[in-house]
Regions:
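...captures the hydrophobic TM-helix bundle architecture rather than a specific catalytic motif
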Residues: 1-494, 498-523
């Protein structure tokens, strides 16, 4: 048996646990939680063993278990192993958490069954070696998530969110099927590695560009990009383990799809430009709305909208290694944030503050941004001299500039007149650490995915325009946020806050346009 088939053991273990859960659906089913946790841990061990296979034997693909290009196959490379490790680790944590969280629920076994099914489907998706398996896993993931979102079927908000999610997922699946059909016509194969290899060496025909557009549409709908983001902010009625799995795992499927077909996407620069524009706007929109949310979970949901937008922006700029790194970092953070959300208020209240709240004036904000940019430029030059400037694409430098704007906001707090010296020193250290971390992680991600993901192409006039627009937009938003305390008491600020807290009513408008989202009251 090929060692590259080893990753298939992980979803098989979870499917076995799921079947056991469905057989014992009730309250406190004997051995079901234990078996589910053991299967999730076993999946993590399989992922670690798959990493060992990759290190010892290099990237490769298994043979097809099936016929005529239809069946199961595994693509083992840096992308799939990274996602395998991420999904199995978070899955194990979520299953372990759910064991206590749902203890005593009337349908505990039913929930565990669908939770394990969802994890198995995601694992089949990220290791798929052929497009048929990828589409089947894509659809199965959506179906399992729908069941989890309706775990409390009598909750009207849960019904509305699940119905809206199912609509966008169905359109996404249709777009993906269309893309796969065009890909098969263009390349005559269902093997993903062969498709990417041919896309890397061929020219972008209209069929390939159309396929890339359909892949982009599928990813946009799956990752809740503006204006289809509303359902993601409405799923708070589901149990916390579902929120953690959704926001830290399933929502990343759109980004993974773009990364997996990166070679094909690069051949359609116009499609990438649309992704960059939509992703950048979604990131800005989600971040601004997030700042106005009063509840922990809704704030985290809007944070996910913003992060998925930023990930889409990275894919649109052809920074696929950084997009993969973003998926890993965001998933780990967001899983912890949701599972720990119950104690968030107490944690914030217990934080020791070194002094009074520092409100920077305009001069402090300008100084902070200039210092942050100087730190970024200095550390970037140091990395360039060490590892070579040819590895620093303009797109990556522009993205790092956006990152440093967030650090500049913190630095402005440290430069305020009322800021104590420990705060000033700490924010300066944070700025330097963020710049070093960005360049180090970017270098590591590009090195690990070399030969698997395409290099970022040289930007043209359109790409330069998009980068300038993104940097200016995020810079203006960061400056406005830093200066907000100076005009927070103005009546216009209060009105703006109300409108932003309602997401500028975009979701309500979409509901009205689509219609049919009212859920009848229970009789």
């Amino acid at each position: 048996m090929s060692p590259y088939l080893l990753p298939l053991c992980a979803p098989l273990l979870l499917l076995g646990a799921a079947a056991f859960g469905f057989m014992r659906k009730g309250r406190r089913p004997p051995l079901v939680p234990v078996c589910a946790e053991a299967a999730a841990l076993g999946g993590l061990l399989v992922a670690l063993a798959s990493l060992a296979v990759l290190i010892l034997r290099g990237p490769g693909a298994s043979g097809l278990i099936g016929w005529a290009g239809i069946g199961l196959s595994v693509r083992l490379d840096a992308v799939s192993v990274t996602m395998l490790l991420l999904v199995t680790f978070i899955g194990w944590i979520v299953v372990r958490y759910a064991r206590t969280y749902l203890d005593g629920e009337a349908r505990q076994g039913y929930f565990i069954g669908w939770l394990c099914t969802a994890l198995a489907a995601v694992l089949l998706l990220v290791q798929a070696g052929n497009v048929v398996q990828l589409v089947a896993a894509w659809v199965a993931t959506s179906a399992a998530l729908h069941r989890l979102l309706l775990f409390y079927p009598d909750r009207r908000a849960a019904q509305r969110a699940a119905r809206k999610k199912r609509l966008f997922s169905s359109i996404s699946a249709a777009a993906l099927l269309t893309a796969i059909g065009l890909i098969w016509v263009s390349f005559g194969t269902t093997d993903i590695a062969t498709i990417n290899a041919q896309a890397r060496t061929g020219e972008g025909s209209w069929l390939i560009v159309t396929a890339a557009a359909m892949l982009a549409l599928a990813a946009i709908l799956k990752s809740a990009q503006f204006p289809t983001h509303g359902w993601l902010t409405e799923v708070m009625e589901a149990p916390t383990p579902v929120s953690a799995l959704l926001h830290a795992g399933v929502i990343n499927a759109g980004g993974f799809l773009l990364i997996r077909f990166a070679d094909l996407m690069v051949s359609a620069p116009g499609v990438l430009a649309v992704l960059a524009m939509l992703g950048g706007f979604t990131a800005l929109f989600g971040a601004l709305v997030m700042l106005t949310q009063p509840a922990v979970k809704t704030s985290l949901a809007w944070s996910t909208v913003a992060q998925m937008g930023f990930m889409t922006l990275q894919c649109g700029l052809a920074l696929f290694p950084l997009a993969l790194l973003h998926i890993v970092a965001h998933s780990l953070y967001k899983a912890h944030a949701f599972l720990a959300s119950g104690g968030a208020v107490e944690q914030v209240a217990s934080i020791r503050r070194p002094g009074p709240v520092a409100v920077p004036n305009g001069l402090a904000v300008v100084r902070a941004f200039l210092i942050a940019l100087a730190i970024y430029a200095g550390i970037g030059a140091a990395f360039g001299f060490t590892f070579g400037f040819e590895h620093k694409s303009p797109q990556a430098l522009a993205l790092g500039t956006i990152l440093i704007f967030g650090v500049a906001y913190l630095l402005a707090q440290g430069l305020a007149d009322a800021a104590p010296h420990p705060l000033t020193r700490r924010t300066a250290i944070y700025a330097s650490a963020a710049a070093i971390g960005y360049f180090a992680l970017q270098t590591a991600a590009e090195w690990l995915t070399a030969g698997v993901l395409p290099a970022t192409p040289a930007p043209g006039r359109l790409e330069w325009t998009l980068m300038a627009l993104a940097v200016l937009s995020f810079g203006a938003a960061a400056v406005a946020q830093a200066l907000f305390p100076l005009w927070a008491s103005h009546p216009a600020a209060a009105g703006l806050r109300v409108h932003l807290s309602n997401g500028l009513y975009v979701n309500a408008t979409i509901d009205r346009v689509l219609g049919g989202w009212s859920v009848p009251k229970a009789s």
